[in-house]
């Protein structure tokens, strides 16, 4: 008889402000969600926190226009509101909170006559993997980004090629990178695929945590369940908004045809929103394919002349990442409920290092943390609570972590699990 092995307690993911201010990075690498200041975090704490919402009528009536779709209130501190298809939304207040407990808000906003000015710590306010690990040798560090977004973005006559480094920013202040790894190959698919955690991010050499593809862990103003157009999840450095994957009820933007088809930059225009971009899960270029607008050069690391033209997919071959996780059963779950799931493992695929004995000490599917973890043979049984506002209809990644004597062992399965709406 195989006796189920329970996982050891999850690592404490909170650190004192002294450590953060002096080191600007965390010794165990995992970044905390918005959780209590002491003790081991409770499961899914960030996933169940309320997301930003529409603004009440009184606040809207008192807001003053700045430029384009941007408005500001006279409150202290002021709210920056964005007009999204006729709705006024507060995109940033929820993400401005001091989630790393260093006394500095994640985001600080101001504006001038032409730009929204954003100071960002580049700090993800959702659960991440512990870095460094067997899939990535780098640590996550707090940043001091300063970005300028055009308040009234303008279309360009040419497509500007995406540089390396940050190309845009999610609502939480974490940056998007283009889909290529340092050597110039596709980082998301094929032989050159790199290890991303289940929130689709990882740190590079200087500690910048960033996304290469759709980060379902970023809170957006409205539920993104495939029943309507997706909400805004970030902005490109030309000032145009980046939306989630859905174009309309049951239709992903990547599958839209005729006049709604996405261009080479992953963007299109409609009467309500004007020109905007969409993320395209599972399809290159995943976030942006180029800048269709006039890019704000001060945001870019690259100096000098920028090239023209959209980027092209250069993926080839099969991924070299060990496919230790074979599947999750069942592969779907409805929102607003707690579920018992089984993560199936194949130890023969652990070619870089043997699969550790015992239960993993961390399992995460998209933004959802396992509340309990047990292992019986090659089956890892977990319980996961899916919050009512979870993103639905999009395949989520799963990663697991083992605490070992050396570097933490991590394994990943892409497109492993899907949240469904209640009546599917």
Regions found by a protein language model. Give the residues of each.
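Solvent-exposed N-terminal domain segments of exported/luminal and surface proteins
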Residues: 39-190
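Short helix-loop boundary/capping segments
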Residues: 189-194, 206-254
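Beta-strand/beta-sandwich contexts
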Residues: 316-360, 407-424
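Short, surface-exposed loop/turn segments at beta-strand-coil junctions that are enriched for proline
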Residues: 385-392
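N-terminal secretory signal peptides that target proteins for export/translocation
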Residues: 1-11
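Extracellular/lumenal glycan-associated surfaces
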Residues: 145, 149, 170-175, 205-218, ...
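Aromatic sugar-binding surface patches on proteins
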Residues: 376-383
């Amino acid at each position: 008889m195989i006796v189920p092995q329970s996982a050891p307690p999850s690592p404490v993911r909170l650190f004192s402000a002294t450590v953060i201010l002096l080191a600007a990075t965390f010794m165990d690498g995992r970044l905390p969600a918005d959780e209590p200041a002491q003790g081991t975090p409770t499961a899914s704490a960030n996933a169940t926190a309320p997301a930003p919402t529409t603004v009440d009528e009184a606040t809207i009536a008192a807001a003053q226009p700045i430029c384009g779709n941007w408005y500001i209130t006279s409150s202290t501190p002021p709210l920056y509101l964005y007009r999204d298809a006729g709705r006024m939304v507060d995109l940033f207040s929820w993400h401005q909170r001091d989630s790393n407990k260093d006394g500095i808000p994640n985001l600080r906003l101001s504006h001038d006559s032409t730009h929204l000015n954003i100071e960002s710590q580049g700090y993800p306010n959702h659960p991440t993997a512990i870095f460094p690990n067997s899939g990535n040798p780098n640590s996550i560090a707090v940043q001091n980004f300063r970005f300028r977004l055009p308040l009234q973005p303008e279309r360009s006559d040419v497509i500007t090629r995406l540089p390396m480094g940050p190309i845009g920013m999610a609502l939480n202040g974490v940056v998007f990178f283009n889909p290529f790894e340092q050597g110039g190959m596709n980082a998301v698919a094929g032989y050159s695929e790199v290890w991303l955690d289940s929130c689709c991010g990882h740190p590079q050499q200087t500690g910048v945590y960033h996304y290469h593809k759709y980060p379902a862990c970023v809170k957006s103003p409205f539920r993104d369940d495939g029943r309507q157009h997706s909400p805004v999840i970030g902005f490109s450095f030309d000032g145009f908004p980046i939306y989630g994957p859905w174009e309309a009820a049951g239709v992903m933007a990547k599958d839209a045809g005729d006049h709604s088809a996405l261009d080479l930059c992953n963007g299109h225009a409609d009467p309500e929103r004007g020109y905007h971009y969409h993320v395209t899960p599972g399809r290159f270029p995943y976030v942006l394919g180029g800048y269709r607008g006039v890019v704000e050069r001060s945001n870019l690391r690259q100096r000098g002349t920028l090239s023209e033209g959209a980027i092209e997919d250069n993926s080839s071959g099969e991924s070299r990442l060990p496919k230790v996780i074979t599947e999750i059963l069942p592969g779907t779950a409805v929102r607003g409920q707690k579920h018992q799931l089984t993560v199936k493992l194949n130890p023969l695929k652990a070619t870089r290092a043997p699969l550790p004995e015992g239960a993993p000490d961390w399992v995460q599917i998209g933004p959802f943390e396992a509340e309990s973890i047990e292992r019986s043979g090659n089956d890892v049984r977990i319980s996961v609570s899916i919050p009512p506002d979870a993103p639905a209809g999009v395949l989520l990644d799963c990663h697991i972590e083992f605490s070992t004597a050396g570097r933490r062992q991590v394994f990943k399965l892409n497109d492993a699990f899907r949240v469904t709406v209640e009546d599917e």
